[in-house]
Amino acid sequence: MSRSALRRVKRLVVKVGTGTLTDRAGRFDRDNCARLASELAEVSRGRKVVLVSSGAVALGAERLGLARSRGKPWDLPTKQACAAAGQPHLMAAWGEALGRHGLVTAQVLLTADDLASRKRFLNARRTFERLLDAGAVPVVNENDTVAVDELKVGDNDTLAALVAGCVEADAVAMLTDVDGLYDRNPAEPGARLLRDVPRVTAEIERSAGGAGSERSVGGMITKVKAARRLGAQGVVTALLSGRRARALPALLAGEPVGTVFAPGAHRLSSRQGWLAAAARGKGVILVDAGARRALVEQGRSLLPSGVRGVQGQFGVGDPVDVAVDPARPFARGLAGYAADEVRRIAGLKTGEIERALGYKYLDEIVHRNDLVVLETGRE
């Protein structure tokens, strides 16, 4: 997608980071919130817009009178308490700011579990659709109060990518406190802003550097990884300053602002997008190099003959990772057989399945229509 094609975007996810909504002292910046609301109202004319907003933890800390000690991160209960105290005020701020422009806001709090479950994912999609059809602006955040560390989405850059898949967005705009992605630390002399990134490479990831600030969870690296994930789904990602006036309208007018990450050539189906972005494999099917080539290069289904083993337990229809090296899954799909059944037919020809099991559901362990190649596992 070229920059000029951004003018044709009809469904947009806008992610606003904590650094954009707070001042240097960590206080909520209502003036910038009001300015962003005006720009969101402008770009929502003729488009459906979903807002993913950070800031609840920072706002809650301000309300509770808690200060973060430099170098000493808060424990999970403290973060959750801040989120609980801050989220109502965050919604009130957006409701008031967008309401001045005649827009109705709707709070949507999600967890990783909500999106990993196909049923709950589809329920969330139907809710989003009804809200967007009614002209509302869904305001999304992770439900930090109930999410546990090991099951958290973790940062709102990743959440924005997951939400984009849920609402089938054309583009994601991430508003941050810098003008875009630079080829090195922007504080260094000679740092160059990268306007257009055709593909997220290992070099691009290295240039993104380390973690977030004291007030935010994610850093540039989480944004770049989200852009890579979105690109694999056929969604364009833009990274631009949430402090620069009219950057968002300029982006959607095709002007040279921020950094634009080009999408892949093919858009995944709805089911494949969910498998790639939101689903979590309940086990791993280990395959040989020949099976990997058949799946990745030829778009084939996974047959028993290429299977070497199974890790974990899963049932028919469960998401399952496919890997040569179990630490680096290269694909994910929906299992046509349960884990114990796959163990019994591993390495066999399709004509031998019924003899081994006494029955046969399918020729394929994972059908190609229920399988997606994961870019993160490509060699």
Swiss-Prot record:
Pfam families for the chain: AA_kinase, PUA
Enzyme class per UniProt: transferase
Protein's name according to its UniProt entry: Glutamate 5-kinase
Designated gene of the protein: proB
Family label: Belongs to the glutamate 5-kinase family.
Cysteines paired by S-S bonds: none
HAMAP family (UniProt xref): ProB
Keywords: Amino-acid biosynthesis, ATP-binding, Cytoplasm, Kinase, Nucleotide-binding, Proline biosynthesis, Transferase
Source organism of this protein record: Anaeromyxobacter dehalogenans (strain 2CP-C)
